[in-house]
Amino acid sequence: MKVTRKATPASRAAAFTALPPASQLATLAAWLEFAEEVYGQARLALGQISDNAHDEALYLFLRTLDWSLESGPEVLEHPLTPSQRIALRQVLHARAVTRTPAAYLTREAWLGGLRFYVDERVIIPRSYFVELIPRLADLLPEGTKVKRAADVCTGSGCLAILLAEHFPSAKVDGLDLSPEALAVAAINVKTLKAGKRVTLHRSDVFDALPPPAKPSEAYDLIISNPPYEPSAHVDKQDPEFAAEPRLAHDGGPDGLVIVRKLLRQARERLAPHGVVAVEIGGLRKAVNREFAALAPAWLETEDGSNCVFVVRAEKLRAWAV
């Protein structure tokens, strides 16, 4: 979760209303320069699409203009029509004054090279699993073919679909407690033609899915990017993050309520060689302290945050809870 200094509605509006004459905002480059000033003055929270104002504003403007995200630098100086300038003004107003997240304005988010539909019913997709999923097979015995996998707290379905993309022989279960989130996930499963490999379930962790009746039904992989923010932190979120469903953020008093349940239930559902991988934000010390008996291993990420831990099935089965 990103946290910025608070700006009042009046200060946000003031930052936006200082709009230069249209003649000074005749190109996308000029609008980008203005947008960066607005982002800074309004103290907008970042981290849902990009961690910097320039990249988020560029994405938002290209989408608003219906220009390709692969556009070259030449588009920056392309003259804008009056209607295009109006459209950019409207979308910047929505972003800066109402603090609407960019992904909710464009109704999309990109992850792992795939476009996912999103709206206010789901958390905006962002996860270190996008870089870690290709490495999960290395955690299994050599030659193991992933046949069964699960994504717990699937939200928009993005990680379940990415699992299916990377492990084409796998049947993937996507589980979520929210029927609203599952409705969005169903859109993405259909749009990305993943219906034969991804099955969605309404479930509080694994409550709706009993332990496997036979070994072939056990999971090789279980992943989860669960709600892990302590409740008190959720109460203080910036408006952009507060616009997302609270259910997707709130991990209980210490952030670990869902994680505890997941680990307890995973031990009955993993194959003997299986692993569970969980993204946990800034709770690494808390995880190491509470689950020391499980010997959690932390996966390295490109930015060094290393906030995803892995536990093996044999450790879970020997765990005294």
Question: Which stretches of residues belong to each language-model region?
Answer:
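Residue-level signal for inorganic ion chemistry
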Residues: 60, 99, 129, 159, ...
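SAM-dependent Rossmann-like transferase core, predominantly class I methyltransferases
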Residues: 75-82, 86-168, 177-184, 209, ...
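A general structural signal for well-ordered alpha-helical segments in protein cores
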Residues: 32, 57, 88-89, 156, ...
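S-adenosylmethionine
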Residues: 134, 169-171, 175-321
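N-terminal auxiliary segments of SAM/dcSAM-dependent transferases
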Residues: 5-111
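Accessory (non-catalytic) regions of SAM-dependent nucleic-acid methyltransferases
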Residues: 1-19, 23-26, 30, 297-299, ...
